[in-house]
Amino acid sequence: MDPTSKSGLNQVSDVVFVIEGTANLGPYFESLRNNYILPTIEYFNGGPPAETDFGGDYGGTQYGLVVFNTVDCAPESYVQCHAPTSSAFEFVSWIDSIQFMGGGAESCSLIAEGLSVALQLFDDFKKMREQIGQTHKVCVLLCNSPPYLLPAVESVSYTGCTADSLVQIIRDRGIHFSVIAPRKLPALRSLFERASSVAGLPESSHPDYSQDPFHMVLVRGIALPVAPGGGSVPVSLKPVLPPQSLPVNQNPLVPVASTAPQMNTFQNVSLHAAHDAAQKALEEAANQQQKNRFGQISTPPFSQSPVLPPGGKPSLSTVTTVSPPVLTQQQVPPQQPQQQTQVPQPGLPAVNQQPPQASQQQPNNQQTPPPTQPGMAAVPAPPPGAQQGVANKVVAWSGVLEWQEKPKASSMDSNTKLTRSLPCQVQVSQGENLNTDQWPQKLIMQLIPQQLLTTLGPLFRNSRMVQFLFTNKDMESLKGLFRIMTSGFAGCVHFPHSAPCEVRVLMLLYSSRKRIFMGLIPNDQSGFVNGIRQVITNHKQVQQQRSMQPGQVQPNQNFLNRPPGPIPVTHGNVPQQLRAAATGNQQAPVTGAPPNQVQGQAQAPGGGMLRLQNPGANPQLRSLLLSQQPQGGMQGMQGMHPIQQMVHAAPGGGAQMQPQWRQPHQGPLMVPTGPRGPVTQNPGMPSVSSVMEDEILMDLI
């Protein structure tokens, strides 16, 4: 088997999925998606995709999607191709949007067309990666049909090539070719074998990744969860990760002393008992955590099969889901390499979910740094942000991060703010040059709702990333920071103008994918500052427009504070007016139009003018409404729409006014009633108008 590259966290990869978009694959796609596609994406992404993750266009994993059909799709194109993206979340949305149609009358599919376009994507990747050099390239074919014996015709560079010749080109270019199918097709297996290098291992040595006995899963360059009952032998076939981290990736329920020789020895027939014990533990873990594969961002799907191949993800995806009793067992033997198991304990997920265990284990983690991994020497102790085991990081800056948040105690004044601070470090990868000599000792952070930053995506991509690590000396502040950063806020760190440093602004985000606090330093500092100012200015203008729209009621607090009297009756405000009328004991007799005319006038605009909770069902309510108007109703109509003035005219003129507004405005009457935002606000959309957020936005401007 071709040696796999190091797993996705520290590797630059180019991944292209070639998927058959016909109805032949549609019934099986959900199973393939959950068992193979999502684990593959998480393998390269470092964890479950999250919408708030920001990745660089040139330094992270690039994903491409090619969807091919059959010859019966004419006159449509044979292939649909999506432009490369660095967002795993966006890539998953592309895959979920595939519509499997056609192909029911065909026994083959246009695999050659799909592979030819995939090769063109890899050519584009090569141009994008000129500054990086060699990357880990993977092409995954998902289909349920054998290929036509026809050459590709739609590709520009590979016209005339058949599927067999295309997989040979894929092999010659060092691209790892994988095949996933819901059934075992000899033609697809032949394609996979043609893409094998001469020095590859025999087919019997490939791990059995299939989660269903009917599935055919032949992969290279990817580490998937090993199928229950078939993963004991292939575990030792891909020793790619460093030996000191391999025991952590094995089943945590088995002593590491028995799994370490298993990883260092390719074929050791004397460890069948250890394999059996590992297999039983694997099945138990899979049964317990199968349902949590992709439902929660904080629970990576690899937790269902802790016995990963050595080419699998490092400890981020596996160890962070280990239960506290298992961690306690792993900490007993002192000779075991524990730097990986210590990482999730002081990390913020442990702070959020298991505070007792985290508080008990953190002192031990800080006082006994593992001497077994040389890469950890650069970090004095794993603070609670070093969830990944920062093996190749160096400290670029040390200081204090300060921010303000609203206190949780309801007894305190709502305008009072609680100032928190945490000692922190900024770390960069080895070889990177970040000049922090002029950075202040204290960084002041202001919180911004992430929904305001969605338009600044290009500026985020054109930025360099650093890692923030925090100590666990103040657990309350650490919990507060984690709670805020995971509830839709981002931190904007402003550097004072008095500091003569190149960086003027830095964004602090919590990456649920990598489980770290990462700082993004935009390369275009002035453009980023202007972008934030523009976003905040636009937000304030929208807020002002909402509060100043004519004919609409101000927020409920202002409305309740108004004295009773003649006020405009608009959307949904009848109960307040009724309350005001009742307190004033205004019981004027009803004269003029009959009640049925009033009811017709109120209902004719389609609920836009006068929206009663139950129109026509409360005659007392109608009489109170009508009794309000003669006492100076013209004063209340001055700020109303002309059509509203007609509707809310004195009751005596109701009969005359009714034909005037019904005939010319019966059709478009619902349009000029104005926006109904303040009344029909969706409670699910978080409003960015709280006291804390408004003050933050004012400070940023």
UniProtKB/Swiss-Prot annotation:
One of the GO BP terms on file: roof of mouth development
InterPro entries with a match to the protein in the record: Med25_PTOV, Med25_PTOV_sf, Mediator_Med25_VWA, VWF_A, vWFA_dom_sf
Keywords assigned: Activator, Nucleus, Transcription, Transcription regulation
Record SUPFAM superfamilies: vWA-like (SSF53300)
Region entry Disordered, spans: 277-388, 580-617, 650-689
Residue ranges of the motif LXXLL motif: 621-625
Gene3D superfamilies: Mediator complex subunit 25, ACID domain, von Willebrand factor, type A domain
Compositional bias ranges of the Polar residues kind: 286-306, 679-689
GO cellular component: mediator complex; transcription regulator complex
Location(s) in or outside the cell: Nucleus
Pfam families assigned to the protein according to its UniProt record, in alphabetical order: Med25, Med25_VWA
The UniProt record lists the keyword Lipid metabolism: no
Main subcellular location of this protein, as a coarse class: nucleus
Stretches with biased composition (Low complexity): 314-367, 593-604
Keyword set includes Aminoacyl-tRNA synthetase: no
Subunit structure: Component of the Mediator complex.
Its job: Component of the Mediator complex, a coactivator involved in the regulated transcription of nearly all RNA polymerase II-dependent genes. Mediator functions as a bridge to convey information from gene-specific regulatory proteins to the basal RNA polymerase II transcription machinery. Mediator is recruited to promoters by direct interactions with regulatory proteins and serves as a scaffold for the assembly of a functional preinitiation complex with RNA polymerase II and the general transcription factors.
Family statement drawn from the similarity comment of this UniProt entry: Belongs to the Mediator complex subunit 25 family.
Name of the featured protein: Mediator of RNA polymerase II transcription subunit 25
Lineage: Eukaryota, Metazoa, Chordata, Craniata, Vertebrata
Gene name as annotated: med25
